[in-house]
């Protein structure tokens, strides 16, 4: 029987640090549900002490996710650990992940402590975390550049204090596979109580070595791998979990290990993270890139026609990538829509069937044939909308020629419908001028992207924008068969977020004034 490698996902913590705009609690919960379907063992949901938003995200995810263990990050500081425990206590079982720097440069120049102090702080942190849970992970930050004697000492002390998972991060992506595997092997050889903990690795991709280093560590005895979906993360990113998953599956006989992942959920999870994080996947990315299973060379195509095994070491179906058959039309009922959602693995509490069906009927009337990927796109977009949106687009008309475009709109502002028309340098510019006039918000667009979310001329188009308002970044998404309408929805998504933030700020200010 082969050993299990535990999969620890940090998309919602380390991965989110790379984003231009933070994910909402609702978006994080969507990703957490997808990770649960994928079969991830541990989900690091956030860093609770870092902000009220992160605290609420961790608490909400801990409340809803039942089949993956939820973890919260904390520094080796009592208040951090207390905050993590408070956010996680709604879960049936949870993990606290605490860390401290151990490399010479970090200890001397960042912490400005002696190594004795660092070991003592780490031990105290683990013992404090054990008051809340018997599942404690301890990380030696920048372990890849830590003198091996110091690393062995810290690992032994943390295990003695009660840590049952020891994480060895290559924090700055500095090591190479033989070197990193050697570090893990040395720990097994020199730390006397190493058998009392699972050794984990967390590799960054600054030199493009994160996946290779993680595999080298597994070969040396590590039995937990940390990473993110699509490899997103700070700087050059993290170890790509979809790549780790398929390496361990495809080469399981050679490596002698396995995971509990449901590999046919990989493609869908990757797409969701890409969409919600507004981070497109490069076409030649391993496993999930658009070209990952493409064969354009005549020699390769000839071989594939004769025997797929000539050039295909895994199938598209193994990651859940399959051609969607014609599924639904405007004559399909609610039961049919729900049946397709059930078949795709979505739980009833992940979407509102009434909202989804109403959006489905509108789309089916416009394009006739609705596919599973259309339903998924509609569901994700509906989950981004809030019923209490103050601004809603009721009507849109565009006239565009070779020089300028004219747009007229009707915008519901609370209970009042307002009309506006504007001329712009193209239909989107004209539409945005209308919205700016009616809402009164002065917004700077940092990024504007349009992507196809379906197939054919009548497929759905998605608009994604990053906007700057008073120094804060906001991410907006719009979805429609008309890309102009999608662009308007994306801007209104941002403006409604700003409007809600302004309302919250006003309430807080009134509370301060009444004290």
Curated annotation (Swiss-Prot):
Its main location: cytoplasm. It holds the Pfam family HCS_D2. InterPro entries: 2-IPM_HCS-like, 2-isopropylmalate_synth_dimer, AIPM/Hcit_synth_CS, Aldolase_TIM, LeuA/HCS_post-cat, LeuA_allosteric_dom_sf, LeuA_bact_synth, PYR_CT. Its EC number is 2.3.3.13. Residues 392-515 are annotated as: Regulatory domain. One of its GO terms (cellular component) is cytosol. This is 2-isopropylmalate synthase.
